[in-house]
A protein has these predicted regions:
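"A position-specific structural signal for the A-helix of alpha-solenoid helical repeats
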Residues: 6, 40, 74, 108, ...
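Structural signature of alpha-solenoid helical repeat scaffolds
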Residues: 29, 63, 97, 137-138, ...
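Alpha-helical repeat scaffolds
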Residues: 21-26, 51-63, 84-98, 121-132, ...
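TPR alpha-solenoid repeat register
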Residues: 3, 37, 70-71, 105, ...
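Structural motif corresponding to the intra-repeat A-B loop/turn of tetratricopeptide repeats
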Residues: 14, 48, 82, 116, ...
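Short coil turns that delineate tetratricopeptide repeat
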Residues: 32, 66, 99-100, 134, ...
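Terminal, low-structured helical/coil segments at or just beyond the last alpha-helical repeat
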Residues: 318-353
């Protein structure tokens, strides 16, 4: 890639979308035949909510018969925002049989199913993503797709399923990124000792790695702190602020977006600070075109309802709960967090009368 192309990509994953768009446009001016430049520009335009320009960029890439996993994935995210179900499936189909692309798009599709609470379908598509990567002997990629699935299970309250999937991933790869996500999943599942040990080891071995020490480790440590000291969780997350809109490695498509904000919102909820919590969870709506099918975006809607209850804004709380339950109208009925949401919403009804 050119210097402009490299910078456009780096700025995109750092969440600096305006600058990324400028660099990516210059890269394309100099060489309009490189697929990833189009992907960077689609990503940047989508983050900026300039959806027409993003769509035009996807179309331009198609006219040049250009494609790679990054570009197809970015166009997939655009189709999700536009609620174009047929386009989503076409993009998944377009990656079929292509090394390094098929598994990426399948994992993307699994996040879409999870966004709507369809866990069984999400698991099945994740299984296909894992198998696709393994067929290409890309064992770390396979493990990461398995961990993406495990992370969703942990967030949905399916802790045993999450642990089972983590064990499966470790059988595929023992890479740094695999252990990093393992630590986060364990933290989100309440396994304090094992997670803490992994986090300490990663921080010691990679002291200069920004993604590890300013995004992943603080997010996991804050998740652990939630169980004993909400104020400490908020303090630990302070260092993540400049990188909140980033997609740091290991990149799991959109499944990790705004993780520090989500955990910070949880900490404020536990402190009883509904207004502050709502501000964090509202970020998923504010950055909807960047969050796309991140399953946390759906859960943030539920957390908004909980936040509004703390501020005695009952009508807003009821609306937030209703919007979450509408999103999950076809969800698998046995998901723990769905049971909780329905029970909370049922109790809310008399308060609103």
């Amino acid at each position: 890639m050119s210097a402009h192309g490299d910078l456009g990509y780096l700025l995109a994953i750092l969440g600096q979308w305006e600058r990324s768009a400028q660099e990516s446009k210059e890269a394309l001016r100099l060489d309009p035949t490189v697929a990833i430049y189009y992907g960077n520009l689609v990503f940047a335009f989508r983050g900026l909510n300039r959806l027409d320009e993003a769509k035009t960029t996807c179309q331009q890439a198609q006219t040049h018969n250009l494609e790679n996993a990054w570009l197809i994935s970015d166009c997939y995210g655009l189709a999700f925002v536009a609620r174009e179900a047929s386009a989503l499936q076409e993009l998944v189909n377009s990656a079929r049989g292509k090394v390094g692309a098929e598994d990426v798009l399948l994992s993307n599709a699994s996040d879409t199913e999870a966004f709507y609470g369809r866990s069984t379908k999400a698991r099945e598509i994740s299984r296909r993503a894992v198998e696709s990567a393994l067929r290409d002997n890309r064992r770390e990629a396979a493990a990461l797709w398995q961990l993406n699935s495990a992370l969703r299970e942990a967030e949905f309250g399916n802790v045993e399923e999450a642990r089972k999937q983590v064990a499966a991933a470790l059988g595929m790869s023992q890479s740094r990124d695999v252990h990093l996500l393992q630590a986060l999943i364990l933290a989100r599942s309440g396994e304090m000792a094992r997670s803490q040990s992994l986090l300490d080891d990663l921080a010691a071995r990679f002291p200069l790695n920004t993604a590890i020490n300013r995004y992943w480790v603080p997010t996991a440590r804050a998740s652990l702190a939630l169980q004993r000291d909400e104020a400490q969780a908020i303090e630990v997350l302070r260092i993540t602020a400049p990188y909140e809109l980033a997609y740091p490695d290991p990149t799991l498509q959109t499944g990790i977006f705004l993780y520090p904000a989500f955990v910070r919102g949880e900490a404020y909820l536990r402190e009883g600070k509904g207004g502050e919590a709502a501000a964090e969870f509202q970020k998923y709506a504010t950055y909807r075109t960047a969050a796309v099918n991140c399953p946390l975006g759906a859960l943030a809607q539920l957390q908004l309802g909980r936040s509004y209850l703390l501020t005695s804004e009952v009508d807003k709380a009821r609306t937030a709960y209703q919007e979450f339950l509408t999103l999950w109208k076809d969800a698998d009925p046995d998901i723990p967090i769905l049971h909780q949401a329905k029970a909370e919403f049922a109790k809310l009804q008399p308060l609103a009368n």
